[in-house]
């Protein structure tokens, strides 16, 4: 089967991907977030930015980990100030989770840098 893309283009893609990954880690400044599951969580939240989620809804954003692990990931992000947790005004027994302004800026900086890397 003939190659669809030249090795030169493939190499360029791999290098850009590695640069993008390194930038993700540098932006967060904490190795705990250098994890694809956090990438899933944060980028899916960014796609739905402006919405507030229950913790259960957020666990579905990390399909490759167990519910128990997802609970820990969300709680860590809350404790580190990347996710904001507030009381649900409709049902005061529930909490709603949103992206903190800090996380929104980090994700948008990452996206801008990645787009530039891949251009």
Give the predicted meaning of each segment.
Residues 1-11:
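General nucleic-acid-binding
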Residues 9, 20-24, 108-119:
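Amphipathic alpha-helical dimerization/coiled-coil segments
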Residues 43-50:
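Short, locally clustered residues in the helix-turn-helix/winged-helix DNA-binding domain
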Residues 78-88:
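A short, conserved structural fragment
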Residues 88-111:
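Short, cationic-aromatic polyanion-contact patches
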């Amino acid at each position: 089967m003939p190659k669809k893309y030249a090795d030169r283009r493939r190499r360029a893609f791999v290098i850009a991907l590695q640069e993008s990954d390194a930038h993700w880690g540098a932006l967060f400044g904490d190795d705990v977030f250098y994890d694809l599951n956090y990438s899933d969580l944060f980028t899916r939240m960014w796609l739905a930015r402006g919405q507030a989620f229950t913790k259960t809804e957020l666990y579905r954003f990390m399909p490759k980990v167990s519910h128990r692990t997802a609970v820990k990931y969300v709680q860590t992000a809350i404790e580190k100030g990347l996710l904001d947790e507030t009381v649900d005004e409709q049902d005061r027994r529930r909490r709603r989770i949103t992206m903190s302004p800090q996380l929104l800026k980090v994700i948008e900086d990452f996206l801008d840098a990645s787009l530039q890397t891949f251009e």
